[in-house]
């Protein structure tokens, strides 16, 4: 079981690294051919990447209340959805403030989630020096979230999503870019010093994604192909059917069994986003903005629910 789980985790890790690397390469090619100001190809790639990531948060009830009574499960889902709805209203009503709050929540959640993924892998490996979380967590979380939103390409991206967010940083864009970049470079140095070369590679790839890919692609690809994939791998250790699959060596089936139950959430997210966007002038831009709002809103209850899972993985 432990050896098979390690194989699954390493495959997912390779997938996330390759996906982000391809996103960087694709961004460079398309930016050169179509221009960095062309948004159509960016929105298409971003929507696909977001679609890959949305199902991972739809299994929170199965992990939190694995054997609960139907009434308790229904109550949990109602409260979960209610919190998300309140978050949607908050983000739409207070665009900038809500955006900043979600950014910090996402950065913290992403960093802790990545460290938890690595710790689960470390538990199944021998002779590995303990990960320096004080450097890895902030670097892994803040790099893919903040850098894409303060670099030179962020203005056009934010304008296409919601013009009200363009100046969210209140003029401190250069300081944020410098601080996060320097800290991540320092964290990479710490990883190399500790001989955590794979973690150093992870941070290098994330730093390149944040600096070289358009903001929409940087966030969406990270969310869907990195964070969501690694979170789903961790879910396979908590879902009985997945554990059974892993024990039997059926790793693909184990992973798919952690994804399929979340597909209705994917459909629901795009249906809700589409309905909210119907009143907009530009369907593509309005739809994408509403899809992001729904995803960000779901982060609020999702982060609260997965805190227990993260805490267990980090101990």
Which residues fall in each region the model found?
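Predominantly late transmembrane helices and immediately cytosolic-facing juxtamembrane segments
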Residues: 113-118, 213, 222-254, 259
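Alpha-helical transmembrane segments of multi-pass integral membrane proteins
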Residues: 104-108, 113-116, 132-155, 173-189, ...
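Hydrophobic, membrane-inserted alpha-helices
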Residues: 23-27, 79-88, 182-187, 200-209
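C-terminal ends of transmembrane helices
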Residues: 3, 55-66, 110-122, 185-195, ...
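Short, hydrophobic transmembrane alpha-helix segments
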Residues: 26-40, 279-283
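N-terminal membrane topogenic signal
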Residues: 1-20, 131-132, 259
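Alpha-helical transmembrane segments and their membrane-interface exit regions
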Residues: 50-55, 103-116, 225-235, 297-301
């Amino acid at each position: 079981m432990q050896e098979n789980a390690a194989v699954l985790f390493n495959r997912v890790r390779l997938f996330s690294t390759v996906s982000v690397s391809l996103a960087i390469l694709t961004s460079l090619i398309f930016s050169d051919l179509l221009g960095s100001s062309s948004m159509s190809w960016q929105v298409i790639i971003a929507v696909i990447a977001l679609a890959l990531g949305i199902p991972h948060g739809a299994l929170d009830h199965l992990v939190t209340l694995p054997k609960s009574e139907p009434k308790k499960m229904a109550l949990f889902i109602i409260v979960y959805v209610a919190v998300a709805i309140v978050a949607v209203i908050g983000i739409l009503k207070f665009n900038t403030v809500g955006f900043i709050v979600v950014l910090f929540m996402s950065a913290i959640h992403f960093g802790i989630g990545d460290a938890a993924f690595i710790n689960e892998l470390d538990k199944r490996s021998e002779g590995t020096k303990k990960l320096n979380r004080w450097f890895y967590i902030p670097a892994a979380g803040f790099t893919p979230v903040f850098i894409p939103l303060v670099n030179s390409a962020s203005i056009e991206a934010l304008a296409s999503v919601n013009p009200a967010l363009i100046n969210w940083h209140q003029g401190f864009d250069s300081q944020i870019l410098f601080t996060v970049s320097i800290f991540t470079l320092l964290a990479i140095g710490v990883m190399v010093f500790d001989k955590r070369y794979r973690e150093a590679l992870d941070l290098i790839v994330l730093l390149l994604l944040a600096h070289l890919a358009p903001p929409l692609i940087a966030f969406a690809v990270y969310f869907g192909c990195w964070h969501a994939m690694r979170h789903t791998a961790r879910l396979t250790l908590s879902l009985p059917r997945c554990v059974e699959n892993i024990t039997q060596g059926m790793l693909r089936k184990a992973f798919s069994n952690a994804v399929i139950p979340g597909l209705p959430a994917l459909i629901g997210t795009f249906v809700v986003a589409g309905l909210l966007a119907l009143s907009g002038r530009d369907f593509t831009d309005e739809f994408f903005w509403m899809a992001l709002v729904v995803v960000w809103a779901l982060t609020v209850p999702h982060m609260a629910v997965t805190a227990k899972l993260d805490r267990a993985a980090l101990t």
